[in-house]
Amino acid sequence: TTTELDIDRGWSPVPMAAFGPHVLTIGSMSKIAWGGMRLGWIRAEPGIIARLLAVRPSFELGTALLEQCIAIELLDDMPALLGHVRERLHAGREAVAAGVARMDGLAMPTTPGGLSTWLDLGAPISTRLARSAREQGLILPPGPRFALGGVLERRLRIPITLTPERTAVAMDRLAAAWTAVRDRTVDDALPLQPTAVI
C-alpha cells in the first residue's frame, strides 16, 4: 500500500483492518524504503494471521535474513524514515509540477502522496506521447498499460520518486516529446515495444 506515503495532508489514516475482523491489509517496505526490498506485512485479526502462518511453509521459500534485519532497523525508526521519504517525494512532485508548468495543454492533478502522478493530456494521445518520449530517450509506459480498453489514453503516469535533478532532465525530454506530438511530427507507424514500467 502507499498509505504511509502521504506528503502534506498531515494525517495518518486508520488501517482498514481496524474496521472489521475479516479485513486484511498489506504493507510493503518496497514502497517505503527501497523498491528492491521485497518484504511486507499483513494486518489482520490474530486468527486469520494464525491460519496464514500455518499454510505459509507450503508456498514460500522464506525471506532473506539480511533484508529482515534491515527492515527491523528501519521499522524501529519509522517516523524518521517516513519524514525522509516525504521530503524526497515532495521535492520530486515539485520538480514534476515545474516541468508540467512549461507545457501548454498538460494538467497535473493535486497529488497529496504516493509514488507518481497522472498527468491529464487533454486528449487520447498517451500512446503517441510515450512513443515520442522514447524518441527523446525517456521511457514511460502509456496510460493504457495500466487499464483495459484504452481507458487511460488521456493520462500519463509520471513518477515523483526521482531527485529533482533527474526529474528536470526527464521533464525536459517530456517537453520535447510533447512539442513533437502537438506539432504532429511523431511517427505513429513506429511500434511501441513492451517496456519496463517506471
Language-model-detected regions and their locations in the chain:
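Short, conserved active-site loop motifs that form the nucleotide-linked donor/cofactor pocket
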Residues: 23, 106, 138
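Conserved glycine-rich beta-strand-loop-beta hairpin in the small C-terminal domain of fold type I
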Residues: 72, 89-97, 107-120
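Short hydrophobic/aromatic beta-strand micro-patches
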Residues: 43, 118-122, 159-161
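PLP-dependent enzyme catalytic core of the Aspartate aminotransferase-like
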Residues: 135-136, 150-198
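Conserved core segment of the aminotransferase class I/II
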Residues: 24-87
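Active-site pre-lysine segment of PLP-dependent enzymes
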Residues: 2-32
